[in-house]
Amino acid sequence: MKALTTRQQEVYDLIRDHISSTGMPPTRAEIAMRLGFRSPNAAEEHLKALARKGVIEIISGASRGIRLLMEDEEGLPLIGRVAAGEPLLAQQHIEGHYKVDPSLFKPSADFLLRVNGMSMRDIGILDGDLLAVHKTQDVRNGQVVVARIEDEVTVKRLKKHGNVVELLPENSEFQPIVVDLRQQNFTIEGLAVGVIRNGDWV
């Protein structure tokens, strides 16, 4: 990898920090505003230079189409906020990679998901925890799953009967989510296989 100029390093650091804080890369306009460029075109030129040096990949056709290549991508990807209608493991959802041995979990974990909310509190899955997830659609009733209903991603206990799925919380303050498979888009994204208390590991 070629050495970066001071300005290129500033652009790279901004992209990395923006992904870390928001879960997605910045737009060209945001880069220009933050670093005092005259226009988004100036930001684009710096991005092209970074791409030539092999530290980022520019994904055409997307305003936030920037992927970091210099990051240490060993370990499990951590998924933060998930944008509506986009794949769970889309690059812009990945906050970082953490050196957690996937084989610590059975079955082995494929990614970590940052938990949002307290609906699974009573089985020890708390707001802000990192949920280890095995990517599969082969799940059974009674298992805790990561599911997508329409454009919402949730962690719940699965109960399926016929064309109806109930997603059960583990907290009496929350109501079950009932899904009619004939009328709603429903996908199993994975099986919960463990929890890392945020701050204890990463």
Swiss-Prot record:
Gene3D superfamilies: Umud Fragment, subunit A, Winged helix-like DNA-binding domain superfamily/Winged helix DNA-binding domain
DNA-binding positions: 28-48
EC number(s) recorded for this UniProt protein: 3.4.21.88
Catalytic activity as recorded in UniProt: Hydrolysis of Ala-|-Gly bond in repressor LexA
Coiled coil: none
Domain of life the protein comes from: Bacteria
Site (Cleavage): 84-85
Active site per database record: 119, 156
Keyword annotations of the record: Autocatalytic cleavage, DNA damage, DNA repair, DNA replication, DNA-binding, Hydrolase, Repressor, SOS response, Transcription, Transcription regulation
Record's function text: Represses a number of genes involved in the response to DNA damage (SOS response), including recA and lexA. Binds to the 16 bp palindromic sequence 5'-CTGTATATATATACAG-3'. In the presence of single-stranded DNA, RecA interacts with LexA causing an autocatalytic cleavage which disrupts the DNA-binding part of LexA, leading to derepression of the SOS regulon and eventually DNA repair.
Record text on subunit structure and interactions: Homodimer.
Protein name per Swiss-Prot or TrEMBL: LexA repressor
Organism: Serratia proteamaculans (strain 568)
